[in-house]
Regions:
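Short, well-ordered junction/capping motifs at the entry into regular secondary structure
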Residues: 1-2
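Hydrophobic alpha-helical transmembrane bundles of multi-pass membrane proteins
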Residues: 5-213
Length: 213
């Protein structure tokens, strides 16, 4: 039964991982043609950064196994610090801890991808990569601990089964803050009026929408 649960979760997380293609095509389709290559590069880069930061410290911060009901989890580095024996089956969860790591890492990349769409054509690529590292290694794990890691929201009875708050609301909050701080895209209001900025490829954007759907 546990092996079946791990196999099923493996299918689900691969589907979530496929959302990265949807985000990439959606963004690349709606930005101006001159920025499409940067958008594709940015989405590949953010996925790599999210995976690295969550492996480096994010997973252990989100699931510290301590400070239940707390707000700030203890900070630890490296998924490997759990010990090799803990990579295997977790009978409390019904699947392997390593499988849970993969499941969560595609979620953190999804949250960062939401931010990517909000700052498209607004933010320097390297500055965005730094922001992606901060979200993946600090913001997402801490707020994820509040619920899924047995923090204070979990203790209060809050339930977020599919990540509407932990993933999507967290990503949306970061996206809104970034958009407000940075301001509009260059050229949007350059003449004192609202200028139309045409997307590079609407069919590609539509395909990305359906992949996400």
């Amino acid at each position: 039964t546990h092996h079946a649960s791990s196999a099923a979760s493996d299918v689900y997380k691969r589907q979530v991982m496929w959302m990265a293609a949807g985000f990439t095509m959606l963004e690349a389709g709606f930005v101006r043609r001159r920025n499409t290559a940067e958008i594709v590069t940015k989405n590949i880069g953010l996925y790599s950064i999210a995976c690295f930061m969550y492996l480096l410290c994010g997973f252990m911060v989100m699931y510290p196994g301590a400070n239940e009901g707390g707000i700030i989890p203890p900070y630890d580095f490296g998924f490997g610090s759990k010990g090799q024996e803990d990579f295997g089956m977790n009978t409390d969860l019904g699947y392997a801890d390593a499988a849970d790591f993969f499941f969560q890492v595609v979620f953190v990349a999804t949250a960062v991808s939401i931010v990517s769409g909000a700052v498209a054509e607004r933010m320097n690529q390297w500055a965005f990569f730094a922001l992606a590292a901060f979200i993946s290694g600090v913001i997402y794990p801490i707020q994820g601990f509040w619920n899924w890691g047995s923090g204070f929201l979990n203790a209060a009875g809050y339930s977020d089964f599919a990540g509407s708050g932990t993933v999507h609301l967290a990503g949306a909050a970061c996206a809104l803050a970034a958009a407000i701080f940075i301001g509009p895209r260059v050229g949007k209001y350059s003449t004192g009026k609202v200028n139309k900025l045409y997307g590079a490829n609407i069919p590609i954007a539509a395909l990305g929408t359906f992949i996400l759907w």
